[in-house]
Amino acid sequence: MRSIVLLSGGLDSAVSLACSLQGGEVCLCLTFDYGQKAAEREKKAAAALAAHYKLRHRVIELPFLKEITSTALVSETSELPAAEEEELDENEASRSSAALVWVPNRNGVFINIAAAFAEAYRCDLVVTGFNREEAASFPDNSPEFVVAANASLSYSTLNKVRVASYTQGLNKTEIVKLGMNMGVPFDLIWSCYGGAEKMCRRCESCLRFIRAAKTAGLQLE
């Protein structure tokens, strides 16, 4: 299988990239800059991961997404929501946090852009880094979303590009363990909503990664 991989530089996308390489050829890694606070760190992490695996990497800029949303991910006046570890498995708390960082149709936009590259490069798959934990609060991480996206792509691409997510049925701990087994370079990953010198260790993305690493026996700096 030939793939275009959506690579944000985070845990899920890094492990999904490694999975893609085991299952076939990765033609291109795509990273999106939509004005998010972590954009520079994500681009740096994604570029480092692509270089590690000796793959082509391209950044696509989508400034309009920042213009049309007030999400805390991009807003200069809104603080990123902090979380507590004990809240990570509480559906109501997770949904409230998700609403604060929601970007309109973000994954839909990403997948359709990647599908255009996939069709042009005669690739079979667009690979995304979804996971079971966040599917409950982010509907565009869910298996139903992938099914719907594939139904749409079967009409909008002549070669019937499909979306695949090798991590979608796994929780974060399982994803870390899978990455450890495949030798994923965790030191290159950026799993934070913020763009400071170091990960904040307070946002939901950080806390999920830290908890998973601890449970899986992965030491973080």
From Swiss-Prot:
Q: Which pathway, per its entry?
A: Purine metabolism; 7-cyano-7-deazaguanine biosynthesis
Give the keywords, sorted.
ATP-binding, Ligase, Metal-binding, Nucleotide-binding, Queuosine biosynthesis, Zinc
> What is one Gene Ontology biological process annotated in the Swiss-Prot or TrEMBL record?
queuosine biosynthetic process
Q: Which reaction does it catalyse?
A: 7-carboxy-7-deazaguanine + NH4(+) + ATP = 7-cyano-7-deazaguanine + ADP + phosphate + H2O + H(+)
MF (Gene Ontology):
ATP binding; ligase activity, forming carbon-nitrogen bonds; zinc ion binding
Q: Which cofactor does it need?
A: Zn(2+)
Q: Where does ATP bind?
A: 7-17
Co-factor remark: Binds 1 zinc ion per subunit.
Q: Which residues bind Zn(2+)?
A: 192, 200, 203, 206
Q: What is its EC number?
A: 6.3.4.20
List the InterPro entries hit by this protein, alphabetically.
QueC, Rossmann-like_a/b/a_fold
The keyword Metal-binding appears for this protein: yes
The family annotation for this protein states:
Belongs to the QueC family.
* Summary of subunit composition and partner proteins: Homodimer.
Q: What does this protein do?
A: Catalyzes the ATP-dependent conversion of 7-carboxy-7-deazaguanine (CDG) to 7-cyano-7-deazaguanine (preQ(0)).
Question: Cross-referenced PANTHER family, in alphabetical order?
Answer: 7-CYANO-7-DEAZAGUANINE SYNTHASE
What is the protein's name according to its record?
7-cyano-7-deazaguanine synthase
